[in-house]
């Protein structure tokens, strides 16, 4: 699994509407604004983040610099480079060849326009063709 994780540090998957790429430090400001939003937190079945932006930046820096072996965090951009959300596959279980998948289109301008569908198709294709994962659940 470790080699699989290392390969994701330069991830770039181009779909019909979106580009999935590795997370970078420049994503922090938009990510923070989405994570503190009560409506988005509710849609993600969680609570809004209560950290200050500085505290959040520390966690974000660690996530970018020291990725977990058990999760892969991915930025979602439009084809013209606008960061509109994130997705991840996590709870990676090598013994069962399975993981969980989550997605959030944080930028409301892109809701209901097919971007989420494009992300799911692109991400699942990547997962099933580039990893040993055989089952993905939501």
Per-region residue spans from a language model:
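Surface-exposed alpha-helical segments enriched in charged/polar residues
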Residues: 61-62, 125, 129
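Conserved acetyl-CoA-binding loop-helix of GNAT-fold acetyltransferases
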Residues: 112-126
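Short flexible/disordered coil segments
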Residues: 107-112, 137-138
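Residue-level detector of family-conserved "landmark" positions at structurally sensitive sites
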Residues: 45, 120, 137-138
């Amino acid at each position: 699994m470790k080699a699989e994780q290392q390969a994701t540090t330069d991830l770039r998957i181009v779909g019909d509407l979106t580009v999935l790429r590795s997370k970078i430090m420049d994503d922090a400001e938009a990510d923070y604004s989405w994570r503190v939003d009560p409506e988005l937190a509710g849609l993600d079945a969680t609570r809004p983040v209560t950290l200050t932006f500085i505290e959040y930046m520390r966690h974000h820096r660690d996530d970018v610099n020291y990725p977990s072996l058990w999760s892969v965090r991915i930025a979602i951009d439009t084809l013209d480079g606008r960061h509109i959300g994130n997705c991840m596959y996590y709870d990676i279980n090598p013994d069962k060849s399975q993981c969980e998948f989550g997605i959030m289109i944080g930028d409301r301008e892109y809701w209901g326009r097919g971007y989420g569908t494009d992300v799911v198709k692109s991400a699942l294709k990547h997962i099933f063709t580039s990893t040993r994962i055989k089952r993905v659940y939501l």
